[in-house]
Amino acid sequence: MKPAPRDIIPYPRFPAAASRDRGLLSVVIPCHDEEQVIDATHARLVAVLPETGMDFEIVYVDDGSRDGTLRRLEAIAAGDSQVVVIELSRNFGQQAAMSAGLAAARGDAIVITDADLQDPPEVIPEMVRRWQEGADVAYGRRRRRAGETRFKLLTASLFHRLFARLMPYPMPVDTGDFKLIDRAVADAVNALPEKRRYLRSLVPWAGFRHEPVWYDREPRAAGATKYSPWKLLKLAADSLVLSSDAPMRLTWVAAGALAAVGCGAALVAATSRQTGLTLAAATAVLALVAAVQTAAVAIVGEYVVRAYREAQGRPSWVVRTTLGRERAKRGSSRAA
């Protein structure tokens, strides 16, 4: 048999829509310092998931919590056979925690959501219905976002639209990580070799049939957000660099604009009789050149750093313990 080309990712064919009425639904929830809300999250999940008509499992991933989150998850798993708890060896970040849960999930369909209840679990049955009707990805699209400042709403909206414009494939806007994906989509994403991941762009990259499920995002049920303005800025930079080469290509645009400015400054210098004005124009152009060069070097440096990290070959996460499955292992690791 002729081997498949190396750039083709093998994964199972997705089932026909008629075969999706039953099966196993996995819900993956990354957790970091969610002690105050995790019991309420679990209660709402177990109340709403039977409405889907599917068997289900809930996969909690403790991402190096420093509070009592892990103890609460252990207590939940002890009383519920449908719960799996994956404890990472340290805090690897939300994207790594979601990827760890996605790799461990066994469902025919997999829902990814956060533990803070801003994305209401009551939307999940509608996502399942869309999947049963033939969608391979049913992603939550936010109609309203309660409890957030106008500044955050504006900056998030602008970033989502800029990000979508820079992607070479269709990218939904006004969305987060709240989505249902088919087993075939999960297999395709899990098979990707890169270790630093941004699932919001990897799932659309995989293709398949996507449908939005509109909902109103709720205020955080308890606790505080784990994303400071600095972390949000870092996430935005990571998402762009990990998902697109557009930032490097934009340096060509900057170079062209700088050339135009330089020509204009040269023209001013040639026609002006005021020495002070000529000196000021030259100084401004030199400062602009230095700024653009520094920015270009910084952008290239970001890509070099990420290439270096990929070349190191380290796993994206390390699992310390797994609770709730007979095949639980200690000290395992997995490269995403």
Regions found by a protein language model. Give the residues of each.
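Short conserved micro-motifs on helix faces and helix-strand junctions that flank
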Residues: P30, L88-R90, K179, W252, ...
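Acceptor/aglycone-binding surface of glycosyltransferases and processive sugar-polymer synthases
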Residues: I86-R90, Q94-A104, Q118-L199, E218-A237
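Conserved amphipathic alpha-helical interaction elements at protein-protein interfaces in regulatory
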Residues: A47, E51, A75, G79, ...
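Generic recognition of well-ordered alpha-helical segments
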Residues: A40-A43, A47, R71, S157-H160, ...
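Structured catalytic core of nucleotide-sugar glycosyltransferases
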Residues: K2-T149
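Hydrophobic helical membrane-anchoring modules
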Residues: K2-D21, Y198-A336
